[in-house]
A protein has these predicted regions:
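Non-transmembrane, aqueous-exposed alpha-helical and coiled segments at domain scale
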Residues: 2-155
Length: 155
């Protein structure tokens, strides 16, 4: 499993000014690594026992019978994996709507829907409906965490 964001580096360097391209690709790789949604979420939140710490706020996950995690957008897969990492056994179910399925992504408790962009498709609509169905059943013993990558929000 490669942790590199640029998957076709060799192909890009195989023609033209390889030295200049290598510098640009190295810088681009570093920027993409820094912007990785999974890594960023781990920087912004962590768990201490049963408490999920987000910034200065603490949420005792043991108070909830069910904890759900929703994510959507191009980084939906990375956000879903971060939710699974962070919530662990407290996660009841995750639902994510992504643009592309990545073979490196392995989920334990997350339903994955591949949505259309810029126009919605049937699978994306099913993912939205799944989130709505869960949200309609919410009560004081349930928690939902939801993150949307910018491109998933209509302008």
């Amino acid at each position: 499993m490669s942790d590199h964001k640029i998957k076709n580096k060799e192909s890009l360097l195989s023609h033209g000014d390889a030295g200049a391209k290598a510098q640009v690709l190295e810088l681009t790789e570093r920027v993409l690594q820094r912007l990785d949604a999974r890594k960023r979420l781990h920087e912004m939140m962590h768990r201490e026992g049963s408490e999920l710490v987000i910034g200065r706020r603490r949420h005792d996950l043991s108070r909830y019978r069910h904890v759900y995690a929703f994510s959507s957008g191009k980084a939906g897969n990375h956000m879903a994996r971060a939710f699974e990492d962070l919530l662990g056994e407290y996660l009841t179910l995750g639902v994510t709507i992504i643009k592309l399925r990545d073979e490196e992504d392995v989920y334990r408790k997350t339903e994955v829907y591949v949505g259309g962009h810029p126009l919605p498709n049937e699978e994306g609509i099913r993912g939205c409906q799944r989130m709505i169905d869960i949200a309609e059943q919410m009560g004081p013993d349930k928690m939902v965490l939801s993150l949307t990558w910018a491109a998933a929000v209509p302008n």
